[in-house]
């Protein structure tokens, strides 16, 4: 089974990008080869670039607080598992408190580190991090894997509150929708939204339909999913078959 997600606004698009980058950082950070730690470090630079949006922190804090207030009202509902509810509220409060405690721009520690800044500026140049360009970085890559990993973890540590806030907001958003089975007749599916506002759409394909690729577009009035399939040169071509899939529309 494969899951495709489509954000309806720039804020959710930014959070999805951060989630993807944090997951990539986690993966390469657990590896041992210097080249894998190079990817981890350049991924950290990408996280700083994406997280540099001025209003991202305030947006996350507002969303965490809104979710906390919404869930707090449910404490008087006897049909709600109060223990699970309290755990989520506590998680929101912790994430909000930790994010509030951060100071300066995201990645300020990296920006203030002249050595990291030199690597960051060279990393955007194709082949720009060779040993003759950055001999000190080349030497660092020959340190033991545990030492390199500890360094990257230290540099990434100030971004942990941002990561935690991003993950809980996306998790609650994904849990807010209900999935339904639909069919793309002749490879195409349309649905009127009647002005209802959504923030995220999920298209889930089972194993039989893994070869089909959804092209998704949406606005506040309707959504459109058109399936394509790659030919021998991997170029997309339209699909005329009826394709069943699961559709989920999410909104807080």
Swiss-Prot record:
Q: Which HAMAP family match?
A: ZapD
Domain of life here?
Bacteria
**GO-annotated biological processes:** division septum assembly; FtsZ-dependent cytokinesis
Q: Which residues cross the membrane?
A: none
Provide the function of this protein.
Answer: Cell division factor that enhances FtsZ-ring assembly. Directly interacts with FtsZ and promotes bundling of FtsZ protofilaments, with a reduction in FtsZ GTPase activity.
Q: Which family does it belong to?
A: Belongs to the ZapD family.
Protein's name in the database: Cell division protein ZapD
What Pfam families does the annotation carry?
Answer: ZapD
Share what the entry says about its subunit structure, partners included: Interacts with FtsZ.
| InterPro entries named among the record's database cross-references | ZapD, ZapD_C, ZapD_sf
Q: Which UniProt keywords apply?
A: Cell cycle, Cell division, Cytoplasm, Septation
Cellular component, GO annotation:
cell division site; cytoplasm
Q: Read off the Gene3D superfamilies from this record.
A: YacF-like, YacF-like domains
Query: Where in the cell does this protein reside?
Result: Cytoplasm
């Amino acid at each position: 089974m494969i899951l495709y997600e489509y954000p309806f606004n720039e804020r959710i698009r930014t959070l999805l990008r951060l989630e993807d980058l944090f997951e990539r950082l986690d993966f390469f950070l657990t590896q041992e080869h210097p080249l894998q730690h190079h990817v981890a470090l350049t991924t950290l630079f990408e996280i700083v670039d994406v997280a540099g949006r001025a209003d991202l922190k305030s947006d996350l804090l507002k969303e965490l607080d809104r979710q906390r207030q919404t869930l707090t009202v449910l404490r008087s509902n006897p049909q709600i598992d109060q223990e699970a509810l309290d755990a989520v509220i506590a998680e929101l409060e912790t994430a909000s408190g930790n994010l509030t405690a951060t100071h300066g721009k995201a990645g300020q520690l990296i920006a203030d580190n002249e050595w990291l800044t030199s690597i960051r500026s060279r990393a955007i140049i194709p082949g720009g991090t060779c040993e003759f360009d950055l001999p000190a970085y080349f030497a660092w890559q020959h340190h033991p894997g545990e030492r390199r990993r500890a360094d990257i973890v230290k540099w990434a540590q100030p971004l942990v509150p941002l990561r935690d806030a991003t993950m809980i907001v996306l998790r609650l958003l994904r849990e807010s929708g209900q999935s339904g089975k639909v069919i793309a007749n002749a490879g195409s599916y349309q649905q009127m939204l009647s002005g209802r506002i959504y923030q995220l759409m999920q298209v889930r394909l089972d194993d039989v339909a893994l070869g089909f690729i959804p092209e998704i577009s949406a606005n506040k009035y309707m959504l459109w999913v058109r399936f394509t399939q790659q030919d021998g040169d991997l170029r997309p071509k339209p699909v005329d078959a009826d394709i069943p899939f699961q559709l989920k529309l999410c909104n807080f």
